């Protein structure tokens, strides 16, 4: 099945979202799958929790990285919503935290950051 048909549009950027209770390893596998064949102009945002631990993930396609979008910077800002921290590279970043109730706000922050960087 083509996962991209489930994408939403944020400020003209194709955006895949994973939200809810998911094992972080499943999210990481999804990122690698998307990275292997991601069309241009694509991001993946994940705000998940498992066993009381929230995790955020951002993947940014290479063309958007070349335009200045930086997953590492965005994840540090969004991680505040889950009382956590994280980092990574311009194309892929993850964060963990202590406040699983904050994943909804974290997703909203990530969406706003994508729109601001578009």
Role assignments for model-derived ranges:
Residues 1-11, 36:
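Hard-cation-handling environments
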Residues 13-118:
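Glycine-rich, acidic loop segments that terminate in or are immediately followed by a histidine
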């Amino acid at each position: 099945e083509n996962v991209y048909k489930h994408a939403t549009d944020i400020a003209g950027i194709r955006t895949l979202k994973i939200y809810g209770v998911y094992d972080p390893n499943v999210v990481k596998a999804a990122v690698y799958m998307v990275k292997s064949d991601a069309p241009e102009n694509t991001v993946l945002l994940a705000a998940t929790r498992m066993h009381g631990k929230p995790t955020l993930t951002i993947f940014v396609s290479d063309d958007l990285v070349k335009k200045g979008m930086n997953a590492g910077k965005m994840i540090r800002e969004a991680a505040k919503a889950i009382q956590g921290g994280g980092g990574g590279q311009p194309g892929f970043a993850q964060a963990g935290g202590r406040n699983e109730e904050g994943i909804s706000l974290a997703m909203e922050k990530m969406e706003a950051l994508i729109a601001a960087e578009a």
